[in-house]
């Protein structure tokens, strides 16, 4: 379903915990990270689409979250031709999104990346509200910045923009570097709130929550 300008209606979700940290998901078998998002189906309202996408991508239900705010209008981004299927080139331009800011009132172990047979993410983590967007695919970065900026006014304590990096502490955002194996203790929240050990690679910091086997 496209509008007259070739944009697909879509919703984006910025999910906060009690510390104003933001949920980031690592795209399945890729090295990019993003917020939950998805298309609005015919007959759906943006809110209905948001709750559906929230469950499909994070396993959370409406009772696990509280809506804090939403963007006033659509935010748009164009998709480069190399990412567009050949049969829709010339018709499809990109996405127009309504963004929702949610507060999670459930527990971390309520998050399940395998809520459907077609998961979007294979790992997730919490990060500070303002972080560099290096790990987000380039053509989405401006929209992410616009959404974060507009919705920051709803935070209980306004989040401060990150200062310039001061040594290794600023490496906590999801940034891809060369492969380097290491053993970490993580939590597989798709099963129970318990600790397990896995081998980590390709990320400077392995996220603390991943899918492990079936």
Curated annotation (Swiss-Prot):
User: What are its cofactors?
Assistant: a divalent metal cation
Query: What GO molecular functions are on record for this protein?
Result: pyrophosphatase activity
Question: Which Pfam families does the UniProt record give?
Answer: NUDIX
Record carries keyword Heme: no
EC supergroup of this enzyme: hydrolase
EC id = 3.6.1.-
Motif Nudix box extends across 38-59
Name the SUPFAM superfamilies for this protein: Nudix (SSF55811)
Report the protein's function.
Accelerates the degradation of transcripts by removing pyrophosphate from the 5'-end of triphosphorylated RNA, leading to a more labile monophosphorylated state that can stimulate subsequent ribonuclease cleavage.
Query: What name goes with this protein?
Result: RNA pyrophosphohydrolase
Q: What is the scientific name of the source organism?
A: Burkholderia orbicola (strain MC0-3)
